[in-house]
Amino acid sequence: MRDYRQSRKYTMKKLLKIFLAALLLFSFVSMTGILFVFQTFFARFDKKTGYLTYEDVEEQYDRTVFTFPSGKNNLKGYLYGEANNQGLVVLVHGLGGGAESYLAETLYFVDQGWKVFAFDCTGSFGSEGSGIGGLSQALLDLRAALDYIRKDSALKELPLMLYGHSMGGYAVTSVLNYDYDITAVVSVSGFNTPLDAMVERSSQYIGILAYLEYPFLWGYQALMYGSTAFVQAIDGINRSDTPVMIIHGEKDRSVTYEGSGIIAYRDKIKNPNVVYKTCWIRFRNDHKNLNVSEDAYLYRKEVKEGYKALSLKYHNKVPREVQSGYDQTIDALRASKLDTAFMENMNEFFESNLNNRYVNRTE
């Protein structure tokens, strides 16, 4: 009996050692994998060709270029419509893009009488930074932009509207957790927290393993951004009575409608001044196509098929000069044409709350 107990004790110790070794190996592989994911998905994004650029419209629209600090990096900012005095729309771009990726929206707001303040987030286009770092960076960069506006004698006097898409849609709502005088917010395809968005997106590639990696994602985010990593959009929305329009595509696969999207938390949002808009039309219900015209949507599909054909022809190694030549054939204005009704809906939301703001100030 004594030998049996000793043998059993030895076996348990051996199993425990194996378990601890496996746990350490899993932890090491997990942290290495997460580091790789962050370095890959949040790498630097530089300007692409084949889309609408300021050079296409510079004769019709003025623009002032400037820089402002965000942490250790200087960000590139752009001010459009300097003669407009209705208010200031601050535009925050999504992951993989820059301010110029949203030039069509910028020019639309300028045409409606707004000044527009757009900027390239850290590690994007004209801004400094070896990479974006993570989704929380957009919130830090927006705060830096708003601090810059606070110090500008002309801009700080204007009613402030926020417009953001995807990562930017998170930033413009989560920034409501802080003390800024915001008149109204439009969030398009925004997520509630960076962690939710990353776990959801990862699960589409590696399934249930994404949830096993949750503690490591949490820890890495905490190391990178501290408490900022866990700022929730819905907490910002509920913190005040700032009017917010939340727009989301029913078939969004990047930030899902009933998953990580802000709109999925609508039953937890108590702010009475929140408006929800669901996009369900076939060609305008995904993550990136909510505000484009039907013609632009169909043309973009045509362009995408052209890219696929080139990729097949050159076995996924398209020569740079061939890629550049194809880009030059793209009609950037046509590909960027917006859906007028969609844009008018947002503009009317801004204008109606602009009027309410002035009413409230006189009461």
PLM feature spans:
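C-terminal catalytic histidine-bearing segment of alpha/beta-hydrolase fold enzymes
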Residues: 272-363
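Alpha/beta-hydrolase active-site loop
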Residues: 132-153
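Short alpha-helix in the alpha/beta-hydrolase fold that links the catalytic acid
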Residues: 256-266
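Conserved alpha/beta-hydrolase
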Residues: 106-128
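The serine-hydrolase catalytic nucleophile loop
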Residues: 95-108, 121, 258
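An N-terminal hydrophobic leader/cap segment in hydrolases
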Residues: 15-69, 76-78, 304-326, 360-363
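Hydrolase active-site cap/lid region
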Residues: 174-226
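Short beta-strand/loop motif that positions the catalytic acidic residue
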Residues: 240, 246-248, 252
